[in-house]
Amino acid sequence: MSGAIFAPLEGLSALDAASGHPLVCPLCHGQYERPCLLDCFHDFCTGCLRGRATDGRLSCPLCQHQTLVKGPSGLPPVDRLLQFLVDSSGDGSEAVRCANCDLECSQQDAETTYFCNTCGQPLCARCREETHRARMFARHDIVALGQRSRDVIQKCTLHSEPYIMFSTDKKSLLCIRCFRDMQGESRAHCVDLESAYVQGCERLEQAVLAVKALQTATKEAIALLQSMVEEVRHSAAEEEAAIHALFGSMQDRMAERKALLLQTVQSQYEEKDKAFKEQLTHLASLLPTLQVHLVICSSFLSLASKAEFLDLGYELMERLQGIVTRPHRLRPAQSSKIASDHRAEFARCLEPLLLLGPRREVSTVGGANTLSGGSSPMVLKTPSCPSPVGKMSGSPVQKPSPHRFISTKVLLAEGEDTPFTEHCRHYEDSYRGLQVEVQNLKDQVQELHRDLTKHHSLIKAEIMGDILRRSLLLDTQIASEYASLEGRRAIFQEIWEDSYQRVATQQEIYEAQLRDLLQLRQENAYLTIVTKQITPYIRSIARVKERLEPRFQVPVDEHAEHGQNMYDETPGRTDPGCTTEKRDKASEPNGSSWSLSSLPEGPSLKNQDHLRPKLEAGDEGWRAGSGSKGACYQA
């Protein structure tokens, strides 16, 4: 049972068909019997999982995720939510007996059998007339059995009193005696059942929207991965065709190299194909889980009463939140391009033959290259790296080669005073500065992303704007450095004509420098994309935080206001009375806040009074650093 039911994946339609019924076990294909929930949110019957645990760990038959199990049974706990849905789905098909005469009524007799919502008992037609004939039963709510209400008042298991309250802190139903036994602090979290039901429905709706968004993203990721698998197949075919075409013209000298290149392509294809299919299998097992839980939510809302909703609804919300917050690999881990660098390999193989001909066969006219233009012709027919063509547009580039650093160090260690040596010294300094700035931005964005996803911290939108501004400025600097480096190509090509050996080393270093700048710019572009994607969520979370917790409503620019207060107090240094008046004026609350929604005057003043110690502390710190001039403010 290693996920074989998801093996024949031919498209999204196959994934939809593999989802199955939410109340049917994927192993035995029957209705759940005491369903057990694993850590991967897959459910199975108790009998289907019995005996599968090994060393306290239970592998999911679908996705192979390990679940820790405790106890001698070796089974996870029973899924109360799914068990409720199973029991509720069978209510309509179960035989009902009259509470008075024990007459069994089938489902076909649902219209001729009655149910007293007041008594909470089913009655046949004859017993209804006999037992509820008296006037004292006139107010009883008697309906047809098929129309009976599910909002039956449940009673507390401890005090046998009806539930009237719900604790939002402990997520539990309370009767009047449970409410009286609670402490005063806990009573503040108690609301009536109707209000708790409305709040719970709103929170469940938000959780369902998050799951639907994840479902949409998963479908898009699956479609992308399926297309990339096809692209890998086409790319491998194209690469093999190119290798065969080049091999045909040099068959005698490159027979061994041909086999090596084909083996390289095949290994890359197998690696990428395996990686994409593994990720596709993982997402294929995730999509049915999302669909099943969405159906569970819909069924739960239609079947559960208010008390049952409050009893199991928060468990459902936690489960949905757990599904959404789990790490899901929705983006491809690598590209679908297969590159064997066959031209360079063939050039190395034919290097002895190429060295026999004349070295200077191409002139240096038009050697300069622009960011958007084509590649310039190489001076020599050497196995050096090709000039980049339009790579600054964001296409994938290679990572910095360690060989470039070693070659640069060797070149600088020779101590020769040449134009290229001076260029390398200047380039290394500027490149290190750009690399440090990019790394700092990467670390800052990673830290903010971790705080946002794991710690759910409130991040100011100004921080994201500053990161975006620095990223755009850094992109301009890298583009300028790249253009400056590209503009020196013609100068260096004239020098490279003097010696082939020196040209081979210098060109390799030069192209590696260009690739390093391309890598830096690509990383910076990724930072810019991530920052733009995170910024709307941070602003949205900030607005929600400000509305839910007024203590987060601080002035728009506390530092700017503080600086303005300092500026206003400067003319009053010669007048002690003016200083006191200015300080009193600066301590008045400001009506602006980060919240977009207008708030009542009371909470706003309280929030700003809460911030006064911070402003006063800032004033004291500024006065302490002003030396003797601060004596006027301290007075």
From Swiss-Prot:
Localization of this protein: Cytoplasm
GO annotation (BP), single: positive regulation of gene expression
Gene source species: Mus musculus
GO terms under cellular component: perinuclear region of cytoplasm
Disulfide bonds: none
Lineage of producing organism: Eukaryota, Metazoa, Chordata, Craniata, Vertebrata
Gene3D superfamilies referenced in this protein's UniProt entry, alphabetically: Actin interacting protein 3, C-terminal domain, Classic Zinc Finger, Zinc/RING finger domain, C3HC4 (zinc finger)
Signal sequence bounds: none
UniProt biased composition (Basic and acidic residues): 553-562, 607-622
Keywords: Coiled coil, Cytoplasm, Metal-binding, Zinc, Zinc-finger
Region Disordered, residue ranges: 553-635
Function of the molecule: Plays a role in cardiac repolarization possibly by stabilizing membrane expression of the potassium channel KCNH2/HERG, or by assisting its synthesis, folding or export from the endoplasmic reticulum, in a heat shock protein-dependent manner.
InterPro entries tied to this protein: PML-like_CC, RNF207, Znf_B-box, Znf_C3HC4_RING-type, Znf_RING, Znf_RING/FYVE/PHD, Znf_RING_CS
Binding site for Zn(2+): 98, 101, 127, 132
Pfam families reported for this sequence: PML_CC, zf-B_box, zf-C3HC4
Predominant location category: cytoplasm
The protein's name: RING finger protein 207
Subunit structure comment from the entry: Interacts with the core-glycosylated, but not the fully glycosylated form of KCNH2/HERG. Interacts with DNAJA1 and HSPA8. Interacts (via the C-terminus) with HSPA1A; this interaction additively increases KCNH2 expression.
Start and end residues, zinc fingers (B box-type): 93-145
MF terms in GO: Hsp70 protein binding; transmembrane transporter binding; zinc ion binding
Entries under PANTHER family matching the protein: RING FINGER PROTEIN 207
Start and end residues, zinc fingers (RING-type): 25-64
Protein's gene: Rnf207
Polar residues bias: start-end ranges: 589-598
Coiled-coil regions, chain positions: 422-460
